[in-house]
């Protein structure tokens, strides 16, 4: 049993009450008057007592006989049920209970995911990455409704569409209404992500759910020393080459030039997962690919990164060692919400930069740019 920590027990004119505070005032949640038995049981719950221990408390208080213990057991169950119904006791919440349907599994790079949620989302976005059941790195659970408790913590990021909070052991994501998502809780080690969506019988927000899960993915991959770079990619001579630049620079256009001129397969139109394995850098396929629709579940050794700049003429410029590190760091979308997370990104950038070719390419949209 877990208590909603936004309630305190206080005595009003000699009568014990449970009083809500914080966000529960705004929701609003009612104050609850306790009788003697309720106050005793509340104190036991605060001590972490089990149902059997709570029953023993009452039996000792009232010197109950064996026959009376049966009636007291019903009282304890009714009391616990009432606290759960009011959101004061978080005993059997959807988050802790999970979903009864068998999970589906998918693999992205070296990581395996257990998924319970809308089948349409899995079929549309993860089926190409499906795998057999095995030990998983992240459990993904999508539920309809509100969480039993409201997490609190320091605000890390706030925009019109999204607020990210640090609630201690988890990151909490609060989305704008158009997403069709109430919130998402992701453990800091990335091992579990629970997304609470609004009722959506027509699955109009399936794509929003998919994009929201990317945040949970980024948390896990960073913990596993894998990082995501905003870039398009193509395959050339058995290696993945990335084209990176700010939105609208022409990443997809430049990759398409290589495809048209040299028949290089396109790997992803927007994002690439990078890691270093046995001192060799790799690019791993991702299902997230922007609006391009171009993605692959395969992974390849990483050949290099081209940092794109629009220009009137085509020109290649070499980069100094510090510029290589900075360019990689600035194109990452892996979390940098805290100093520690930023340093993780920096350390990877420093490790990756000397292992690959990279340059700045000033270019036009003409075939000569490739």
Q: Where are the model-predicted features located?
A:
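A noncatalytic interaction/capping subdomain that flanks phosphate/NTP-handling catalytic cores
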Residues: 6, 11-20, 24-25, 38, ...
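Hydrophobic positions on the alpha1 helix immediately C-terminal to the Walker A/P-loop
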Residues: 254
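Conserved glycine(s) of the Walker
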Residues: 249-251
